[in-house]
């Protein structure tokens, strides 16, 4: 009988947990991770517009390195204050303040967990898929679907734009470990154009 009641209590607490608190709990299981990714961009009709791949490193809070290798190389990296976007093809680096640059993207939820980050979103859950939707009065217009297992392993995410275009990112070689902090700095190469928007 005790075992049954204990199981019932566990079940009740699981049922009562909101999708937002469940997502927060899963995200909080890892202080950081590294993974490879594949990307597929689909038109509203489902046609493949682009495919790519790269790797990502996240160290919570606020540190990330997103390196797209194909089809066109670019690098997005932040030290928690400055966000660098480097495009080697056009030989340009853009510098932005992290807070300003990430205010209107739900991707920030993967990289930190401030209570105020959730103010613009509502969350629904379907198994291991959590749909993070902008509230009606939010400046954010895209929907974010993060796929994360109970143990905190992020298997990927999707971004659905207002016009129906969709970007799917699937993570491979996921490692739940803290990447070294030296991954989150950027030395500007000689000779590149600098667009400082901080």
Swiss-Prot record:
Q: Name one Pfam family in it.
A: LolA
For this protein, the record's InterPro entries field holds: LolA/LolB/LppX, OM_lipoprot_carrier_LolA-like, OM_lipoprot_carrier_LolA_Pbac
Question: Which terms are listed as keywords in the entry?
Answer: Chaperone, Periplasm, Protein transport, Signal, Transport
Q: What GO cellular component entries does it have?
A: outer membrane-bounded periplasmic space
Query: Might you name a Gene Ontology BP term for this protein?
Result: lipoprotein localization to outer membrane
Q: Where in the cell is it found?
A: Periplasm
Endpoints of the signal sequence: 1-17
Q: What does this protein do?
A: Participates in the translocation of lipoproteins from the inner membrane to the outer membrane. Only forms a complex with a lipoprotein if the residue after the N-terminal Cys is not an aspartate (The Asp acts as a targeting signal to indicate that the lipoprotein should stay in the inner membrane).
Known partners and oligomeric status:
Monomer.
The family line of this record is:
Belongs to the LolA family.
In terms of HAMAP family, this protein maps to: LolA
Q: What is this protein called?
A: Outer-membrane lipoprotein carrier protein
Q: Which gene encodes it?
A: lolA
């Amino acid at each position: 009988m005790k075992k049954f009641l204990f199981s019932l209590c566990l079940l009740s607490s699981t049922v009562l947990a909101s999708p937002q608190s469940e997502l927060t709990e899963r995200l909080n299981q890892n202080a950081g991770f590294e993974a490879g990714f594949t990307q597929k961009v689909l038109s509203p009709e489902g046609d493949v517009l682009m495919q790519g791949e790269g790797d990502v490193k996240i160290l919570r809070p606020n540190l990330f390195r997103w390196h797209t290798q194909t089809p066109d190389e670019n690098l997005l990296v932040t030290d928690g204050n400055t966000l660098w976007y480097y495009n080697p093809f056009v030989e340009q680096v853009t510098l932005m303040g992290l807070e300003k640059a990430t205010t209107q993207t739900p991707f920030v939820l993967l990289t930190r967990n401030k209570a105020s980050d959730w103010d613009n979103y509502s969350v629904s859950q379907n198994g291991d898929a959590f749909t993070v939707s902008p509230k009606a009065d939010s400046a954010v217009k895209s929907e974010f679907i993060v796929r994360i297992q109970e143990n905190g392993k992020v298997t990927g995410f999707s971004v659905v734009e207002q016009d129906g275009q969709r970007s799917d990112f699937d993570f491979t070689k996921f490692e739940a470990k803290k990447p070294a902090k030296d991954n989150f700095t950027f030395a500007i190469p000689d000779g590149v154009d600098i667009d400082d928007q901080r």
